[in-house]
């Protein structure tokens, strides 16, 4: 039995609310159960120096957690003077995931920066961030299209992410913190709307897992991502 009493293949309650920040070109408040992330997408008429003059744009991401997103206060990274390794890893993952489904040439020589700020953390902050980031990005691109700044289909597909793991010997979908901290195995799957893999992160925390168990986790992830993609499409209309 899962602590949340969910079925093994059951997502937490998920919501994706678009257009929640009035100043941002795109925004989304994403909730995976008690994990809440505010995502904004900002259009910038600038590019990294190494991209200038190449006729294509760029999508990048930043990630952070509010000090009381967790049970005990976490020191702000700004006060420490540097980002920790986990933060850097996650924001690079978010940026990579988004770029796989964006036509950077169609975007033109401009950059979209996606900021993911964790308001409350209960497991799965990176997967919630990626899922909400797609909505904020789509919101931003719709804003640009309404102003004739872009033409055609800049977004090639959806992208969403979900965690899976083996908890008490059972493969389960969408781990919350209580499950993640006790899981024998946990993995994060990033997938496109048509089911292709973007990235897989998997770790045996206590017991090595077999190929069959991995395939069971991937099957759960495919089911979960398909549901998330449906919710993304509903959110952007």
Curated annotation (Swiss-Prot):
Q: Name one GO biological process term.
A: rRNA processing
Say which domain of life the source belongs to: Bacteria
Name its species: Rhodopseudomonas palustris (strain TIE-1)
Q: Which residues bind phosphate?
A: 86, 124-126
| InterPro entries to which the protein is assigned, alphabetical | ExoRNase_PH_dom1 (IPR001247), ExoRNase_PH_dom2 (IPR015847), ExoRNase_PH_dom2_sf (IPR036345), PNPase/RNase_PH_dom_sf (IPR027408), Ribosomal_Su5_D2-typ_SF (IPR020568), RNase_PH (IPR050080), RNase_PH_bac-type (IPR002381), RNase_PH_CS (IPR018336)
Q: Quick check: keyword Ion transport in the entry?
A: no
Q: What is this protein called?
A: Ribonuclease PH
Enzyme Commission code(s) on record:
2.7.7.56
């Amino acid at each position: 039995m899962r602590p949340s009493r969910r079925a093994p293949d059951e997502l937490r309650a998920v919501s994706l609310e678009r257009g929640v920040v009035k100043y941002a070109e795109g925004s989304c408040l994403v909730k995976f159960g008690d994990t809440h992330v505010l995502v904004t997408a900002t259009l910038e008429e600038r590019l990294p120096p190494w991209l200038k003059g190449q006729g294509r744009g760029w999508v990048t991401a930043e990630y952070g957690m509010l000090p009381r997103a967790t049970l005990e206060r976490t020191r702000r990274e700004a006060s420490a003077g540097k980002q920790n390794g986990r933060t850097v890893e996650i924001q690079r993952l978010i940026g990579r995931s988004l770029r796989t489904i964006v036509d950077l040439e169609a975007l033109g020589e401009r950059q979209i920066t996606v900021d993911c700020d964790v308001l409350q953390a209960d497991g799965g902050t990176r997967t919630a961030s990626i899922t909400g980031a797609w909505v904020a990005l789509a919101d931003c691109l719709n804003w640009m299209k309404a102003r004739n700044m872009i033409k055609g289909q800049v977004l090639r597909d959806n992208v969403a992410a979900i965690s899976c793991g083996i908890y008490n010997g059972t493969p389960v979908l969408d781990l919350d913190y209580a499950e993640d901290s006790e899981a024998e195995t946990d993995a994060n799957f990033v997938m496109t709307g048509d089911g292709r893999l973007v990235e897989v992160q998997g770790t045996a925390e206590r017991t090595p897992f077999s190929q069959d168990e991995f395939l069971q986790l991937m099957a759960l992830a495919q089911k979960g991502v398909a549901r998330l993609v449906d919710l993304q499409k509903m959110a952007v209309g």
